[in-house]
Amino acid sequence: MPPGRKQGAGCWTCRLRRKRCDSVQPVCGSCQSLEITCYSGEARPSWMDGGSDQKHMSESIKARIKHNAMLRRERRLMANEDHDIIMTMETDHRAPGELMNSGSALGASSSSRVSNPVLEYDSLADSSASTPSTSSGRPTTLRSSVDRFDEGQSPLTVASWASGPPTLSSGYSASSTRPAVPIQVQLGSAMIYLDYVFPFLFPFYQPSLIETGRQWLLGLLCQNDVSFHIASSLSAYFFSLVPQGDDQDMHDDCKALVWDKLIEQMDLAIGSIQSTVSAVSSSGARTPLLDKTRIMQEITQLLIVEVTVRNNVNWQIHLTPALSIFDEIFKSHGLDQSSKPSLNILSHALPSSIPVTTQHHKSLPNTADQSALTFFVSLLLFVDIMASASLGTSPTLQSYHESLLPSQSDQDFHISLEKVLGCQNWALVAIGNISALCAWKRDAKRGGNFSIFRLVSLAEPISQALERGLKDLDTSPPSPQPTKTSAGRLEAYYSRHDKAIDHKFTANITRIWAHAAIIYLSVSLSGWQTNNNEIRAAVAQVLALLEMIDSPGQLRSLSWPICIAGCLALPAQVPAFRRIVGTMGPLGKFGTLSNALSIMETVWNSRDSIDSNTWDIASALSIIGSPALLI
């Protein structure tokens, strides 16, 4: 029959989908718009049998429609810089809540610390990772760990890092006739992650050109397929939350599809890291330092993503092995002559990609691996402190604080948490010390040897450190600005980011953390007393400082102090905390601030039932079911 002619009651594809068909030959309008195969003709297809073949074909077509919708969306994402995208889909989907429940097995693992976390990480991860679909409806992007699963191979081994970056595929996949995602779309998703997602997660991290900028982050994405896919999926999820103007929000079906893809990639990552940890465990001490650091980075990256997008996730199954590897690499490669941990020694133990044949009187710029190591060491020290507050335990890495997190940086290679998190070292170290104090208090009461005088004496140095730190913030002058000569302008450009955050502003960020620490310490000493003068003054200070912040990314980074101050807020202050969190809009779902608000709301609704003598910060952070990691 000539093209454009109509025939019969519609094509077999539309009949299978129970959709209206315009019966145009050889491809009807519905199939053409959805970019799926149009099965036309008088003869009934063999799969239209009312049985298993018909069901399988129906599922295959649904998956194909989803895949094509994703490709159309990504093509539009690349073409429209103003993010003006509206999509509709004609397919069933799983709701985000159902998907979150399907991944809730992550929380099934015991909260206790494993005896050998690196060796047992794979068994813990088994309980949390769902098996990825291998149906023809699964999108093909990079030649990823999905393909390795299909081939019965290990998704990731230590040796895979030496084989170079993942290959950006084009044309057709070897295992399918479906077209792969165009390379422009793959790179576009990576650029969204580099330009928008990562800066939103870490708004204070602005390394200079001399520090190699963020090139290490691109290297991390190219390190293996899993990292790339997680970043790409996280970019899509972030994009789905960004307000796109009046009446232009993304379609709910598309949001569900993006969420589905993100969960799939996170589950793949768990399986991949599981395989890697097993390989390293079998290699033991023979595993190169660079491989160990990259494994630590992979686990930490997954931890951040899990906590960012999932509620009530069992984050301990990721944090425990990451901290174990941290401890192992420092003890094996990062101790100085006095057996103290040194990031300088550990950093220089990494292999250099730049051959040095002559002696240099000045230090060379960091390599990408050194910059990545510094970032993740900083991040793990911070996450460990936040975890200790949630669990009511001493920080696992507390013995590293004195050497790696000094109050005042000197010429040695020390960590500056301010460069990564916007908060100076002393405030976060104080929070870790308060967690250790809470652990001591609990154990002393259980052992029957608790002394209030001993508690006060242990708390005194912490209180003094907080007072001294706040006083120094008030008296220390701002960082000097570079001179307005041509050389000064050039130096300002390559030594600091041209949009570097002002010293006075980061001082306010540190003040917020410090006042939250004061609240934490007061509760540890006096119990849950919202009318305590010291607590009331600190809550008021936090609230006033929060009013000065207009950046959603910076507000997101303050989830913990917002939650601590909000939980102890007076009823009259509650609307202000709700309003501040509400300014995040849809982006409040991207990160832990929404979780912090849930905790605050539950605490506010439980005021009358809280026992002020036994209730503490760890109790509050666990009030919605499991300890919350607010990072």
Swiss-Prot record:
| S-S bonds | none
Q: Name one GO molecular function term.
A: zinc ion binding
Enumerate composition-biased segments (Low complexity).
Answer: 123-144
What happens when the protein's gene is inactivated? Completely abolishes the production of pestalotiollide B and significantly decreases the growth rate. Reduces the expresssion of 43 of 48 PKS genes present in Pestalotiopsis microspora.
According to the record, the residues making up region (Disordered) are 123-148, 469-488
Q: Where in the cell is it found?
A: Nucleus
**What InterPro entries would the database entry show?**
Fun_TF, Zn2-C6_fun-type_DNA-bd_sf, Zn2Cys6_DnaBD
Question: Which gene is this protein's source?
Answer: dibT
Q: What is this protein called?
A: Transcription factor dibT
Gene3D superfamilies for this protein: Zn(2)-C6 fungal-type DNA-binding domain
User: Could you name the Gene Ontology cellular component terms for this entry?
Assistant: nucleus
Its induction note reads: The expression of the dibenzodioxocinones biosynthesis cluster is positively regulated by the transcription factor dibT.
Keywords (A to Z) from UniProt: Nucleus
Q: Which residues bind DNA?
A: 11-38
| Function, as annotated | Transcription factor; part of the gene cluster that mediates the biosynthesis of pestalotiollide B which is part of dibenzodioxocinones, a novel class of inhibitors against cholesterol ester transfer protein (CEPT). Acts as the key transcription factor within the cluster and positively regulates the expression of the cluster genes and the subsequent production of dibenzodioxocinones such as pestalotiollide B, pestalotiollide C, 1',2'-dehydropenicillide, 3'-methoxy-1',2'-dehydropenicillide and 1',2'-epoxy-3',4'-didehydropenicillide.
